[in-house]
Amino acid sequence: MRAYYKHLKSLLAAAVLLVGTNTHSQAFPPGTFSVDGIPVACGGVWFVLNPNLPDVGMADGQGRIFLNSVVLGQLPTMLKLYWISHECGHYFVGSDEDAADCWAIRLGRDQGWFPPEAFQLLLQMFQNNPGDVRHPSGPQRVSNMMQCYSSQ
């Protein structure tokens, strides 16, 4: 009977998760998501692919990371992993964008999937970004990223 309730609880959690997504979204429970054949995990966080998301990705603070599948599909693997790690980083360092950038950059550098040439692509992607209310300007972000990549 206990197993029945555990299974029912998982099904209800999945149903609640899917209610907040559109019909084109795909939800992946913890431990089931991969990028270009590389398994990706962020603790107990679900990944939700949504082609209509108005950003590359976002962490909702409720155990979900939403990713724009169209935008991600246009990026090389290392940049996909950066964005996923950046959003995952918000679960570890909070809402600070510079801290999430730094967390993702160091993770990629230390795990070996973010070599210097891939890091240069990231800097190019951000250098002319104007920023917004929540995100620093491109030059500020690039400066922070360079410090993170070169520091321990």
Predicted regions and their residues:
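Bacterial N-terminal signal peptides that target proteins for export
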Residues: 2-12
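N-terminal signal peptide c-region/cleavage motif recognized by signal peptidases
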Residues: 20-22
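Auxiliary, metal-adjacent structural segments of Zn-dependent hydrolase domains
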Residues: 24-61
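Active-site scaffold of zinc-dependent metalloenzymes
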Residues: 48-77, 88-91
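Active-site recognition of the HExxH zinc-binding catalytic motif
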Residues: 82-91, 101
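An active-site-proximal "capping" alpha-helix that borders the catalytic cofactor pocket
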Residues: 95-111
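Long, well-structured alpha-helical subdomains associated
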Residues: 113-152
